[in-house]
């Protein structure tokens, strides 16, 4: 009887140990982050009181979302010696161009963006109301109660006039060299890249991503920015100069309140 109870207890304990959920390792948790195509890493971080007051977190260089993708090296193929000087693996056509075709290839994007928008609206409203009634006459005489003879005259005139106008224009020129990060099934290339400039009082950066056609690439390995599909171009900066261009948190608070 004692042996039966001991064996039953042993089986019960082993079953409970099997039902415990697997423990996730710290490496798996730390290696999982959420990144965006242009804005970069969106994971929460303790950036300090300054970023909390200005309600903005500056991007940093070396963001994993913008890291270049390099193709893996192919293993060397040792072919049998044939005695010929011609090697098919290293040959290329004399009519071949130098356009990018694979992951890791580099292409220069010429930035030539210019947009203009103008809108105006005018509104004029005018409404008039006029109502009157002659005195009531009974037997050739006006019917009165005291000094009131039951006559009235009402006039109302409402006018409204308003106008609004809005104009906006933006332009950007320059160039940035990006890399191919993916080759789609139809042959189109997904590109992505960034460029950072370090200044005395901060940094300036340009980020670009989108999809291009190999046929739109010029002979000098450049492509215009208006040829990029789903283009996302971001030009901004960090540091004191960028902070001076934005209103403080008190100014934003009173603007919202009004």
Curated annotation (Swiss-Prot):
Region forming the signal peptide: 1-15
Residues linked to a lipid group, N-palmitoyl cysteine type: 16
UniProt subcellular location: Cell outer membrane; Bacterial flagellum basal body
Region span, Disordered: 34-64
Lipidated sites in chain (S-diacylglycerol cysteine): 16
Family statement: Belongs to the FlgH family.
Subunit description: The basal body constitutes a major portion of the flagellar organelle and consists of four rings (L,P,S, and M) mounted on a central rod.
Function of the protein: Assembles around the rod to form the L-ring and probably protects the motor/basal body from shearing forces during rotation.
Protein name as it appears in the record: Flagellar L-ring protein
Gene name of the record: flgH
